[in-house]
Design a protein with these regions (language model features):
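Short, Lys/Arg-rich, polar N-terminal cytosolic tail immediately upstream
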Residues: 1-12
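A structural signal for multi-pass alpha-helical bundles of membrane permease subunits
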Residues: 16-282
Length: 282
């Protein structure tokens, strides 16, 4: 039996080596698109094709020193951060209610909420613009934040409900016996155990809001000083009918940093929250 196991491992050795080599080559192929902006960002004469770069930090200096790009980044943080806060608050309340209370038509309501995710944004942007125009919300941060939050709320509601479902109701009932109110048990018992759901929802919402292009393009068409980074990146691509590839590469790198940083931050937080929730459950 030991001999057969050794022979099987010996046969699997070359196959495993080939599999790792294939995965390594595939990973390198997938990383090539990320190599271009890194090289073009430090190239004084960057072009569309990769070549030995003429090393310079002029493109980074241009972005950092120009107040226009700092304003674009600030606008993106205001819009994405505001939408994330609104979605977290609404989805936490709605997800808890859908998880803990039964009412007629709950399943129909949940699937109806999910169905709205199938409607493309291009089909709703015109009526959305008309509604926000009637409410005097066009060309305002509030209008864009509410619009993006409404688009992201269905998925967030499903996520939060799923995480609340993983928290046993018996823990809440035990806290009621100890004198806590429903609100108190939701804050002190349920919320810490459902913390991974908050992190996942915040991550998805922020990334979607940060990368949203169509909604701010239409709703902020009359206020260029409030446009986010996504629109600024597009305008840098078509400015003067001449593409500054080095500047575009730097903007693309800067544009991705917040989402990547938030991912790693939330990833560590999720690990800690999951361990804490497991210990509390014991």
């Amino acid at each position: 039996m030991l001999a057969s196991s050794a022979a099987r491992r010996q046969r699997q050795g070359p196959a495993r080596l080939y599999a790792y080599a294939f995965l390594l080559a595939l990973s390198g192929f997938c990383l090539v698109p990320f190599l271009w902006p890194l090289l073009a960002s430090v190239d004084g004469h960057a072009g569309l094709f990769l070549r030995a770069p003429d090393l310079t930090l002029h493109n980074f200096h241009k972005v950092v020193s120009d107040p226009t790009y700092r304003r674009l980044a600030l606008n993106s943080f205001i819009i994405a951060g505001g939408a994330t806060i609104v979605v977290l608050a609404a989805s936490a309340l709605g997800g808890y209610a859908l998880s803990r209370f039964s009412f007629p038509g709950r399943r129909v309501f949940m699937f109806g909420v999910l169905f709205t995710r199938m409607i493309p944004a291009t089909a709703t942007i015109v009526p959305l613009y008309i509604i926000e125009g009637d409410l005097s919300l066009t060309d305002t941060y509030q209008g864009v934040i509410l619009a993006i939050a409404a688009q992201q709320l269905p998925l967030a509601l499903w996520l939060m409900k799923g995480f609340f479902d993983t928290v046993p109701a018996s823990l809440e009932e035990a806290s009621w016996i100890d004198g806590l109110s429903r609100f108190g048990s939701a804050i002190r018992i349920v919320a810490p155990l459902a913390a991974p759901g908050v992190g996942v929802t915040a991550l998805f919402t922020f990334i979607e809001a940060w990368g949203d292009f169509l909604t701010p393009l239409i709703l902020l068409s009359g206020s260029p000083d409030k446009t986010p980074f996504s629109i600024g990146l597009f305008r840098a691509f078509i400015a003067f009918n001449l593409v500054d590839w080095g500047l575009l590469a730097v903007l693309a790198i800067v544009y991705t940093i917040p989402a990547v940083a938030l991912y790693f931050l939330v990833r560590r937080y999720l690990l800690r929250a999951t361990m804490t929730g497991g210990l509390a459950g014991e």
